[in-house]
Amino acid sequence: MAEGRGAGTGYASLTALGLAPGALALAIGAAFVAAFVRGLAGFGMAILLVPLLGLMVLPVEAVIVSNLLGLLIGLSSLRQTWEAADRSSALTIGGLAMIATPFGLGLLHAIDPAWARVLIALVAVLAFVLVLLPPRPDGHSPHRAEVAATGISAGLLTGFAGMPGPPVVPFYLRQAIPAARARASMLLVFLATSLASSVAGLAMGMAGARHALLAAVLFGPIWLGNRLGGMAFGRVSDRLWRWLVALLLAASGTVALVRLIP
């Protein structure tokens, strides 16, 4: 009887998630890989996770779950991130992004999905082009307009696509700062955008118990993948890390362009 009750409970859990066992296994695998990339590169979890989850749940739900997972994993390593980040720029960019995120969520509901894919593709390609530009000279201090544009666009993209990375990554990658500081600064910004999008989703009635349950189920592989990715980051040089980040941006741009093909 106990075994039967256990099987019934497991079935009920899958029913609550709305996923078949095979789909859930795929989601767990995707979460692990996406989190490993995040731990190594400092970003990329949403870029990989949202499209894959979008095959199993509605695109809006994939964005919501990805944002919830970004919040949970960001809080789990907040102390290390806070100590290593360039807090002056990260807090400004993160604050502006939090303000802009609800407007991105509004756009997600208002714009035609076909146009949404075009805009996301353009942003992803532009981010890769910016990374290829020459790095800033030593001692360069970003202009206020550059900081503001980075924060606002990151917030809009967080709400719109769950992808704050395209404007934030080039901003830090082109700065003459160590890879560890750039990575931590990006992670601090992404924690802010995850918090804003999660709160906005709840306030707008877009996030519910099902999304929280799916995020809770996926958090285990997310934590493990992020931990292993962070360990791998400690074994690569600054130069190699920057190339890996550029390649990840190129891959995201390619995927976004492929999705435009009918």
Predicted regions mapped to residue ranges:
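Short, strongly hydrophobic alpha-helical membrane anchors
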Residues: 1-22
